[in-house]
Regions:
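Short acidic (Asp/Glu) and glycine-rich catalytic loops that position anionic groups and cofactors
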Residues: 16-20, 48-52, 105
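Basic, short loop/linker segments at the boundary and entry of helix-turn-helix/winged-helix-like folds
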Residues: 28-73, 78
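Catalytic micro-motifs at enzyme active sites that drive phosphoryl/nucleotidyl and oxygen chemistry
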Residues: 96-102, 128
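Polybasic low-complexity intrinsically disordered regions
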Residues: 115-172
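Major-groove recognition helix of helix-turn-helix-like DNA-binding domains
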Residues: 100-116
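Charged, often Cys/His-bearing segments associated with DNA-binding zinc-finger transcription factors
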Residues: 1-42
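DNA-recognition alpha helix
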Residues: 85-98
């Protein structure tokens, strides 16, 4: 089923696919086959209490927080560090799980979420990077997974995102 969702305050819309909640959850058995599945598996194990909501006025604040957490982890894993670009990914991704009547997150909200939920973003980003390393091992590019190095790389990418956002704010 297709619905229309508002992309921003203007009159532009984006098409989105809606599905029952069980389809939006991890519906794979065993190892994740995509980076999206790897990130979603990491997001699913994070407790609601560990997340600060994106918006206190949201209808389902933890659903929003989980969607933004998955978005940021996937973007940082794919080396998209700028919050404005991440917001654009959310606006143009038909699979981004967002309630159609609520405004999509903007760059400011994504930056605030990253700061307030740094540990959760770090954990999900580590899972995404671990998945990417496993893919490289399967392709024969790498020979082993280095857990401490993945943790350092996740921290470095979060710092890169903060730096990219600060550079953008300096330019305004």
């Amino acid at each position: 089923m297709n619905t229309m969702t508002m992309m921003d305050a203007e009159t532009r819309f984006r098409a989105t696919r809606t599905a029952p909640p069980f389809v939006l959850q991890n519906n794979f058995i065993g190892r994740p086959r995509t980076i999206g599945q790897a990130v979603q598996a990491a997001v699913d194990v994070i407790e609601d209490e560990a997340l600060k909501p994106l918006s206190t006025s949201a209808t389902r604040p933890f659903t929003q927080s989980r969607a933004v957490l998955a978005l940021l982890a996937r973007c940082y894993a794919q080396q998209i560090y700028n919050a404005t670009q991440a917001a654009s990914v959310a606006a143009h991704d038909p699979d981004f799980p967002w309630l159609w009547w609520e405004a999509l997150p903007d760059a400011r909200a994504l930056r605030r979420f990253r700061v307030e939920n740094r540990e959760a973003v770090h954990r999900c980003l580590e899972a995404a990077l671990h998945f990417l390393v496993e893919q490289k091992i399967s392709a024969g590019v790498l020979t082993k997974v280095d857990g401490p190095q993945i943790a350092k790389e996740a921290g470095r990418r979060i710092i890169m995102a903060a730096f990219a956002d600060s550079m953008e704010l300096d330019g305004e």
